[in-house]
UniProtKB/Swiss-Prot annotation:
Annotated protein name in UniProt: THAP domain-containing protein 1
Coiled coil: 149-196
Family: Belongs to the THAP1 family.
Gene that produces this protein: thap1
GO MF entries: DNA-binding transcription factor activity; RNA polymerase II cis-regulatory region sequence-specific DNA binding; sequence-specific DNA binding; zinc ion binding
Keywords: Cell cycle, Coiled coil, DNA-binding, Metal-binding, Nucleus, Transcription, Transcription regulation, Zinc, Zinc-finger
Localization: Nucleus, Nucleoplasm
BP-aspect Gene Ontology terms: regulation of transcription by RNA polymerase II
Lineage of origin: Eukaryota, Metazoa, Chordata, Craniata, Vertebrata
C-alpha cells in the first residue's frame, strides 16, 4: 500500500523522485504518540499502524544528524501544520493543497468564529469546519481530511474472507480424509475377521508324536521286507 500523510490538508504520497520521507506514529510510546495527535489538531483521529506523517511537518532538528537515512529522534514531535508548510530539506518541492478556489480566504475568518484567542493570527492554525462555506461545492474539493483507513479496512476484510475460504477448504479436505480412514479401518477389521486358520486339506492329518513315530517305524519295516 502506498504511504500517505495523515496530516489535515496534506496530499503527499510516497514517490521515489521526491525528497519526502514518511514516519509512522510511535504507537509503542503512548506519551509521544499523544503529542503527535495533539499537534495535528484533528478531531476524532485515532492513528493505526498504517498511519504516517511526512517529513514536511518536522523541523530539521527533529532528525538524527549522524544517520545516513532520515531517522527521527525519540522525542521528535511534528509542528509544521500551517497552510504555508515549508520543507526544511528541499525548497523546490511543491506542497499542493486540495482547497476549493471559491472558499472564503482565511483573512475573513474572525478569531471568534474560529475559536482563536485574542491576538493570535488566523493564518497560524487551520480553520475548523465552521469557517468552511456550506453547500455549493463538491465535498471532495472542500474536505481535505484523509487517512485512508477505509481502504485499510477494505483490504483487511478481503484478507479475512480469503482466510475463511481457505479454512473451509481445509475443513472439507480433512473431513474427506477422515471418512477415507474410517473406510480403511472397517475394511481392515473385515479382513481380520475373515482370516482363519489355513485349511490342511485331505492330504494332511494331525497325529500325536508317539503315534507318528510308531507309524513311521512300521513303514520302515515294511520297506525292508
Amino acid at each position: 500500500m502506498v504511504q500517505s500523510c495523515s496530516a489535515y490538508g496534506c496530499k503527499n504520497r510516497y514517490q521515489k523522485d521526491r525528497n519526502i520521507s514518511f514516519h509512522k506514529f510511535p504507537l509503542a510510546r503512548p506519551e509521544v504518540c499523544v503529542q503527535w495527535v495533539s499537534a495535528m489538531s484533528r478531531r476524532n483521529f485515532k492513528p493505526t499502524k498504517y498511519s504516517n506523517i511526512c517529513s514536511q511537518h518536522f523541523t530539521s532538528d527533529c532528525f538524527k544528524q549522524e544517520c545516513n537515512n532520515r531517522v527521527l529522534k525519540d522525542n521528535a514531535v511534528p509542528s509544521l501544520f500551517t497552510l504555508q508548510t515549508q520543507d526544511p530539506f528541499s525548497a523546490d518541492v511543491c506542497f499542493p493543497l486540495n482547497v476549493c478556489a471559491t472558499a472564503e480566504p482565511l483573512s475573513e475568518c474572525f478569531p471568534e468564529q474560529c475559536g482563536l484567542p485574542d491576538g493570535q493570527e488566523a493564518g497560524a492554525v487551520s480553520c475548523p469546519e465552521q469557517c468552511v462555506p456550506p453547500g455549493g461545492q463538491e465535498a471532495g474539493a472542500v474536505s481535505c481530511d484523509h487517512n485512508y483507513t477505509l481502504e485499510d479496512c477494505v483490504q483487511q476484510k478481503r484478507r479475512v474472507q480469503r482466510l475463511q475460504e481457505q479454512m473451509e477448504k481445509l475443513r472439507r479436505r480433512m473431513k474427506t480424509l477422515q471418512q477415507k480412514c474410517r473406510r480403511q479401518e472397517r475394511q481392515l477389521e473385515r479382513l481380520r475377521a475373515n482370516r482363519g486358520p489355513a485349511p490342511l486339506g485331505d492330504r494332511y492329518v494331525i497325529l500325536p508324536r508317539e503315534l507318528y513315530e510308531e507309524l513311521q517305524g512300521v513303514e520302515t519295516i515294511g520297506a525292508v521286507h
